[in-house]
Amino acid sequence: MGRGGCAQLSYSELLSRRRELERKYLDLRFQLVVEHVDNKLMKRILRRQIAAVNTFLRHKELTELEKRGVRE
């Protein structure tokens, strides 16, 4: 799923996606320690995907606060 696909997900779907990516990232880190991994760049790719999801989550949080008239 590209970054554009994340923008259309709901807040709960984004949280679920982040948990899924974090689980994959931890599994990959374990595999890197225990055995050989074919695509070592996958670790960087997963970190960037997690960062993108976090960005969309924060944007949705700020948008919701703005709708309520709350300022940080």
From Swiss-Prot:
Give GO terms: molecular function aspect only: structural constituent of ribosome
Q: Which UniProt keywords apply?
A: Ribonucleoprotein, Ribosomal protein
Q: Which residues form a coiled coil?
A: none
The record's SUPFAM superfamilies line, in alphabetical order, gives: Ribosomal protein L29 (L29p)
GO cellular component entries: ribonucleoprotein complex; ribosome
Q: One biological process GO term for this chain?
A: translation
Give a single Pfam family match. Answer: Ribosomal_L29
Could you tell me which HAMAP family the record lists for this protein? Ribosomal_uL29 (MF_00374)
The entry's family comment says: Belongs to the universal ribosomal protein uL29 family.
This chain's protein is named Large ribosomal subunit protein uL29
Q: Write down the species.
A: Treponema pallidum (strain Nichols)
